[in-house]
A protein has these predicted regions:
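Surface-exposed loop/linker segments characteristic of extracytoplasmic
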Residues: 1-225
Length: 225
């Protein structure tokens, strides 16, 4: 929901006031549907060729296309399911991360990244985001995919940067990598060749530069990248 809560700071207070962050959205209501289909350029990468509102089935909510966002927060280096223990990244459902919690240092921690929804050459979907909210966990219990919409599915260990697997990780149409927003506000370019591991046996530990940057408090040393 971070994209939604940011609206008042983007001169979009009237739109924010039309959408309650604490209530389900009635997408059968034509007025509500028109609001959540609003295209917000600030939430789109300039290089994006994504159809907007979303046309990819994986980016729709209950089959309904609504406005896209290319930007998602990092939830850490592990799997995130609705009933999982607290993730170790900055953003996750009901997160309340404060600056003091990021003990690895703001310049050493991923906050946000980008993701395209355009299929790659292999035909796999890049699962993108919507800005208006999230789908409820109750719709598919214990399934972390339920929070991919507009929240935190920049999940380390899934397809890596610009990978060719099913796209839950960072992706873009930029040559060679993606842009990332660090916790200190700096924007950097993360190469698709960054030191990373896609080994399921190491998914819960910070075993590479990529993993360590996604975690806010593991105490691991991070070199140049």
């Amino acid at each position: 929901l971070c994209n939604l809560f940011t609206l008042p700071f983007m001169d979009q207070a009237p739109l924010y006031n039309k959408i309650s962050p604490n209530s389900p959205m009635d997408l059968t209501n034509t007025t509500v549907l028109a609001d959540v289909r609003t295209v917000l350029p600030a939430y789109l990468c300039p290089s994006s060729a994504d159809p907007n509102p979303a046309q990819n089935a994986d980016n729709k909510v209950n089959g309904v296309a609504i406005g896209l966002s290319n930007y998602l927060g990092f939830n850490g280096n592990g799997d995130y399911r609705c009933n999982s223990s607290k993730p170790n990244g900055m953003f996750y459902m009901n997160s309340q991360t404060r600056i003091r919690d990021i003990t690895d240092g703001l310049s050493n921690t991923f906050a946000f990244t980008e993701r395209t929804t355009v299929n790659d050459a292999a035909g796999t979907n890049h699962i993108g985001s919507i800005w208006a909210g999230v789908t409820p966990c109750a719709s598919t219990p214990n399934n972390f995919e339920n929070i991919r919409y507009g929240l935190v599915q920049a999940r380390v260990g899934w397809s890596m940067i610009n990978g060719t697997g099913y796209q839950f990780g960072p992706s873009s149409l930029h040559e060679g990598g993606v842009h990332v927003l660090m916790a200190d506000g700096a924007v950097r370019f993360a190469s698709e060749n960054m030191d990373a591991s896609n080994n399921p046996s190491t998914i819960s530990s910070a075993t590479s530069t990529y993993f360590r940057l996604a975690v806010i408090n593991d105490g691991q040393v991070i070199g140049e990248w």
